[in-house]
Amino acid sequence: MTQFTEEEKTIRRIERRFNKGVVQYGLIEEGDKILIGLSGGKDSLALVELLGRRARIYKPRFSVVAVHVVMKNIPYQSDTEYLKAHCEAYGVPFVQYETAFDPATDTRKSPCFLCSWNRRKALFTVAKEHGCNKIALGHHMDDILETLLMNITYQGAFSTMPPRLMMKKFDMTIIRPMCLVHEADLVELAALRHYQKQVKNCPYESQSSRSDMKGILRQLEAMNPEARYSLWGSMTNVQEDLLPDKID
């Protein structure tokens, strides 16, 4: 019987869940050209590794390119030379794109929302410039479940970030290939790979409600170790006849 090291077990577990998500949600098709959003955090670094390796080994055949968006007026900084070297290690071309936004233009929305939206627009621009038909983002299962809880709590909506989303306005498909990967495994991978941390973190990070939802997800898993799978399953098990039905 083959004995695997702890590192090998972690990598095999991540790749198994990654490949399952890609296949289960039909995220990659023959001839795709996929732009990877590379922020510089552990999740996007892992995504470069996983997609770069899959592009060389598995069918259907597809190609990838990674972009790091620099928001010039936000003191959030990554070592771009490190990011470029990381991409080269997995055969992924690297692009850097600079942009900026003014948080004062819309005080009704948080700086995080405005920054995220402007980064997203930059991704669409670069994707079109490089002939890409899909954009891959590094959201994992925890991100998706936390967003589900946030939307229920703050928006009164049963919605989240889906593994695959067609953005008709931009004629572009957003994919999240790590949708079934657990954040704990990515933390372990980052330690095993010695991923370099960002030079400076975003000053608005602490204003996010996401850390609160991380705590709630941990509490749910303390009550029920299978809670994350129950939450995930609930998104495709909506029993409408057992929900309130308004009479117009």
What is the predicted function of each stretch?
Residues T2-E146, Y154, A184-L192, L242:
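ATP-dependent adenylation/nucleotidyltransferase module used to activate substrates
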Residues R13, N118, V181, S208, ...:
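Conserved active-site and cofactor/substrate-binding residues in soluble primary-metabolism enzymes
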Residues R17, G21, I216-Q219, S234:
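Residues that form generic nucleotide/phosphate-binding pockets
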Residues L27, S206, E221-P225, E240:
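Alpha-helix boundary/capping and short turn/kink residues
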Residues R54, S110-A122, Q155-T160, D212-Y229:
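Short, structured secondary-structure boundary patches
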Residues K134, D142-A222:
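Catalytic subdomain that performs nucleotidyl-dependent activation
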Residues E226-D248:
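A short, charged, Gly/Pro-tolerant segment at domain boundaries
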